[in-house]
């Protein structure tokens, strides 16, 4: 016996028809796809209206605005954060280690002012 039985032929014909209908259903109508309205932020809405006429000076203003936003968000704020971290968390803090001040003896000179400490009258073991 060669070939398909009548039941197999009918089944294959129905599968082909089903495939054709499925492929036809996949074609989009001119109204599809229906996209939801896009939400626009207030600043974006402002710039869209501002740039509508396409004047060159408006493009320059917009580009300056965009570059300044980039500079603030990608340069200034990270630099401030790094500066804060280095200033308050990494550098050695003053007055954390308490040391005695060096002793001052009669006849010594104070470096900051150049003042000479006077000799004490009647103090034993002073060079004369």
From Swiss-Prot:
Tell me the Pfam families matching this sequence.
NDUF_B6
Q: Which residues carry this modification: N-acetylserine?
A: 2
Q: Which residues carry this modification: N6-acetyllysine?
A: 24
Where in the cell is the protein located? Mitochondrion inner membrane
Species of origin reads: Sus scrofa (Pig)
Q: Which gene encodes it?
A: NDUFB6
Membrane topology type: Single-pass membrane protein
Q: Which family does it belong to?
A: Belongs to the complex I NDUFB6 subunit family.
Q: Where are the transmembrane segments?
A: 64-86
Q: What is this protein called?
A: NADH dehydrogenase [ubiquinone] 1 beta subcomplex subunit 6
What GO cellular component entries does it have? mitochondrial inner membrane; respiratory chain complex I
Q: Does the keyword Transport apply?
A: yes
């Amino acid at each position: 016996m060669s070939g398909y039985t009548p039941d197999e032929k009918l089944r294959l014909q129905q599968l082909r028809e089903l495939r054709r209908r499925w492929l036809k259903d996949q074609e989009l109508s001119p109204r599809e796809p229906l996209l939801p309205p896009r939400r626009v932020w207030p600043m974006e809405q402002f710039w869209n209206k501002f740039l509508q006429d396409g004047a060159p000076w408006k493009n320059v203003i917009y580009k300056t605005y965009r570059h300044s936003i980039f500079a603030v968000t990608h340069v200034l704020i990270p630099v401030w954060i790094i500066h804060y971290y280095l200033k308050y968390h990494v550098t050695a803090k003053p007055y954390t280690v308490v040391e005695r001040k060096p002793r001052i003896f009669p006849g010594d000179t104070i470096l900051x002012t150049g003042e000479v400490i006077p000799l004490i009258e009647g103090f034993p073991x002073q060079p004369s």
